[in-house]
Each structure stands twice: as C-alpha cells, then as structure tokens.
C-alpha cells in the first residue's frame, strides 16, 4: 500500500493471478516476480529512500524487477549460497551467479541475496551496474512467454545505499517466496479452469454416433470430476486469501495450498 500501489486485498491479488494464468502461465509468472519477489522486499525491508525511488515506477511497469536467490548448485538449500558481497568502504563488491531467474534479461533491477560477512543480505542491483550481466537461457519446453535468465556478478560494484537494511538471514527471501507461492496457488486454478473450458467445448463439438460426446455419461462423469476438483482448489485458495488478509496465516498454509492446487492444474 502506498508508493503508487493500490493496496488491494490478498484475495484481489489472488484473483488477478488466477485470471492471468487462465490466459498464460508465463504472464502470471512475470506478475508474481514483479510484485512478490521484487517489489515486496523493497516495500517490507527497504529504506524510505529505496521505496520512494523504485516502487512508484515498478508499480506502473516503468521499471521491471527480478529476484536472485537460486544458484547452479544451491536451489533447495539456499543457506549454502556461494554468492558473496564484500564491504569496500564506500561500496560493496558482489561476486557469484544466480540461475533460472524469471525476468532477468529484461529487468531494470534485481533484488539479489548474497552473503556479507557470512550473513545473507539483500541488495538492489541495477542493470547498468559495472560487473553485472544477465544472459537469457534458451531452449525451454514450456513457459516460453516468460524470460528466464542467469545473473552473473563479476566484481559488481554496488553503492552502499542499495543494501536492504530491514532484514538479515533467510527470513528475507523466504518471506518473498511465501507471497509468490500464494499467487501460484491461485494461478494454478486459472490454468485448470482454462483446461476445463477447452475440454467442455471439445466435448460439445465432437460428434460420435450422431451425438456430441458430452451427451455420454462417461464424459459427463469426467467433466464433473474435473469441475469438482477445480472448485475445491479455488475454495482452498479463497480460504487462504482470507487468512492472509486477516493475518492468521502461517507458511505451512501457503505450501499446502500450492502443493494441492498445482497438482490439480497438472492433472487437468
């Protein structure tokens, strides 16, 4: 809320993710990274100067952000990340690499997590910072509308005022991931709804034995099962959204909703 942002509820955010992914998972992925992984840490952990400088332009889409946590050898174990920041007096030097980064090549800034004196800290890296590059990764089999990149830091010089002052340790990136997973739990429902609508349209238009196959009980049963499971997933996402809005959620709620709903999306 504030800094050019509308301050919508979590349920409203979830519904937006659902409808975006109903159209294309890559579009929802872009929005999740921009809001949950790039804007959120600046809003929650950044200084007032950082918030005022970046958030209004990110809210309008003038600036695109990305999130650098995962490394080639450290995905599920980010606490052992290799990327390091060194305090050089009037600036930091960043060295390392991040992998499979959504929006990386097109981003104007990256929120990067690195170890400074053994403690994980967040840094805002701008695309023109010396020593920073973001080559695009190609040859993907899916999510082709979403840009995926590597982030490379070779003595990347970061001004002192670009460290996020409000958090230390894995709480920072994990807080961001919780918000992104919340959006994914809704987005998966949208993907499943799109599959259901396509299936229903096909069943109504495909003629066998002189009748649409939708008139056969076996097909009706399959469609009913699909709609039942999708509706249950949406109710779970809505319940989670209410808990997010009233502040009674815990991280396990988000993980369980994402686990259930992406399975529904995959199965359909």
Model-flagged regions — what are they?
Residues 1-33, 45-50, 57-62, 77-78, ...:
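Alpha-helical interface subdomain recognition
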Residues 36-44:
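Helix-loop "lid/cap" segments that line or gate small-molecule binding pockets
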Residues 44-46, 86, 112-115, 124-127, ...:
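Short beta-strand-to-turn element immediately C-terminal to the catalytic PLP-Schiff-base lysine
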Residues 61-69:
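A short, Trp-centered hydrophobic/proline-enriched beta-strand micro-motif
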Residues 73-82:
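Active-site-adjacent elements of ketosynthase-type condensing enzymes
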Residues 80, 128-160:
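Flexible, small-/acidic-enriched active-site or ligand-binding loops
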Residues 91, 95-134:
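A short core secondary-structure module
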Residues 99-105, 142-143, 179-183:
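Glycine-rich phosphate/pyrophosphate-binding beta-alpha loops
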């Amino acid at each position: 809320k504030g800094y050019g942002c509308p301050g919508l509820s979590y349920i409203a955010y979830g519904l937006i993710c659902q409808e975006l992914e109903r159209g294309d998972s890559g579009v929802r992925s872009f929005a999740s990274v921009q809001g949950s992984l790039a804007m959120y840490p600046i809003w929650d952990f950044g200084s007032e100067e950082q918030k005022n400088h970046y958030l209004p332009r990110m809210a309008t889409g003038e600036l695109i952000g990305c999130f650098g946590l995962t490394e080639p050898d450290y995905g599920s174990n980010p606490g052992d990340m290799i990327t390091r920041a060194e305090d050089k007096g009037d600036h930091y030097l960043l060295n390392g690499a991040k992998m499979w980064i959504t929006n990386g090549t097109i981003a104007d800034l990256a929120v990067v997590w690195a170890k400074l004196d053994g403690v994980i800290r967040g840094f805002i890296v701008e695309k023109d910072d010396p020593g920073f590059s973001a080559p695009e990764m190609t040859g993907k089999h899916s999510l082709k509308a979403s840009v995926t990149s590597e982030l490379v830091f070779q003595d990347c010089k970061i001004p002192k005022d670009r460290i996020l002052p409000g958090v230390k340790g894995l709480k920072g990136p994990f807080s961001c991931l919780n918000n992104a997973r919340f959006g994914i739990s809704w987005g998966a429902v949208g993907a499943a709804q799109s599959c259901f609508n396509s299936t229903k349209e096909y069943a109504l238009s495909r003629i066998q034995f002189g009748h649409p196959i939708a008139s056969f009980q076996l097909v009706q049963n399959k469609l009913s099962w699909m709609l039942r499971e999708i509706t249950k997933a949406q109710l779970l996402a809505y319940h989670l959204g209410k808990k997010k809005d009233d502040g009674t959620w815990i991280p396990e709620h988000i993980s369980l909703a994402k686990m259930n709903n992406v399975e529904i999306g995959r199965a359909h």
